[in-house]
Amino acid sequence: MAELIFAERPELKGRIHIAYCPERVLPGNVIFELVNNDRVIGGIDDASADAAAEFYGKFVTGQLHKTNCRTAEMCKLVENSSRDVQIAFANELSMICEKAGINVWELISLANKHPRVNILQPGCGVGGHCIAVDPYFISSAFPNEAKIIAQARSINNYKSEWCVEKAKNAILSFQLKNCKKPQVALMGLAFKPNIDDLRESPAMKIAKRLFAEMPDVKFNIVEPNISSHPDFDIVDFQTAFEQSDIVVYLTAHKQFFMLPQEANDKLILDFCGVIKK
């Protein structure tokens, strides 16, 4: 942007300040983190970095770290790519453990007892407008070097497909065993727990896939943080649990932990750690 401005108005160079200051905020806790988190201040020159730091210093209580704008932009991409890689490791473990007959939640809990191990929790993929998007900027710009980053994206995208196949197999098995189609509760559409943000949500992608590929199945779609959706009728989480033969946990919203951990008349598929037994 600076290059475009100064190409058209070269006399403005040195008279206006431009800086890139990536946000580090958690959905659902934005204001607190906007104020308290450390910030990276990337100016196109020292004067720009100083001016931006002075502005952010008026309301940010965290430390301000000045650098150049290119490093600041890469810092944002690297932060989210790092999270994506770590989540991919957890998601890959969950698929390995399913084949090996090992409880992945117990395994991760035990492995994390090691003082230098901190494995994240697996889910049904990665969503949101940052972690699921930013790695592509690095892998597309540096395709020969960004091997791990690109592979992590593939793993996290595949995890959603894996969940779809697991759910479809459970539905087909129920039909063969009971000679009828099941009611299926799809629990959660948001990309992470306890928010209403559906952007790039793997849970949403899974729900849409199942809804489209199994039109004769009754799906009870649950998202306690929204009141309506243009594509689905939203069902209360308790009603969906009670009425469904198969319960599929896609997002670990706090309300779901109030439901029974076991039910003799239901098959429960837990892709996000609501039930960790």
Segments (PLM) and residue ranges:
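Structural/interface elements that position substrates and couple domains in central-metabolism enzymes
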Residues: 1-277
